[in-house]
């Protein structure tokens, strides 16, 4: 196996930062609605749709352009590195969010790409920790769909 364990984490963090910037500075404006009483709010349905579109874009770009040449085994180990990082830093930011607010915001920027899963889980009424576990674990393994099958060597 090539030393490719870092590819999924680096790609996903870079894509997350880009997604976060796009949501905050450009695309988030699409979700703003004026309510009948004149107040301004964010439409959660539009936000979930926006997050889903960005997620699909990240998955397709990563799968077709960055991970297509990797085997499923390589993608699995690389994705597992990201999952471990998500779990450790996710719990750390949860426990220290009042103390290390700037780190919490930084980690949010670097883990934004899979946020659609936690948004859907909240929409379905799942508990906070279950939705966090889904968002931390499931998205990186979607790249397995784009990997090559392992060719056994004799």
Please report, for each region that a protein language model flagged, where it lies by residue.
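Transmembrane alpha-helical insertion/packing segments
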Residues: 1-52
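Cytosolic juxtamembrane helix at the C-terminal end of the final transmembrane segment
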Residues: 3-4, 67-70, 131-154
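Hydrophobic alpha-helical membrane-insertion segments
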Residues: 11-22, 77-101
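Transmembrane helix-loop junctions in multipass membrane proteins, especially transporters and channels
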Residues: 28, 32-36, 67-71, 94-106, ...
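Hydrophobic alpha-helical transmembrane segments
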Residues: 48-56, 116-141
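Membrane-interfacial helical/loop segments at transmembrane boundaries in membrane proteins
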Residues: 102-123
């Amino acid at each position: 196996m090539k030393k490719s364990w870092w590819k999924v984490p680096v790609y996903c963090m870079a894509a997350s930062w880009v997604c976060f910037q796009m949501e905050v500075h450009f695309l988030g404006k699409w979700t703003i609605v004026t309510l009948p009483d004149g107040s301004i709010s964010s439409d959660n349905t539009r936000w979930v749709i926006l997050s889903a579109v960005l997620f699909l874009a990240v998955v397709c770009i990563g799968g077709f352009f960055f991970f297509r040449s990797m085997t499923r085994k390589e993608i699995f180990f690389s994705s597992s590195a990201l999952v471990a990082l998500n779990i450790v830093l996710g719990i750390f930011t949860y426990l220290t969010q009042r103390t290390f607010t700037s780190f919490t915001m930084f980690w949010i920027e670097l883990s934004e790409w899979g946020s659609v899963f936690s948004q859907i889980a909240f929409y379905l009424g799942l508990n906070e920790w279950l939705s966090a576990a889904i968002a931390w674990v499931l998205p990186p393994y979607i790249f397995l769909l784009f990997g090559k099958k392992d060719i056994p060597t004799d």
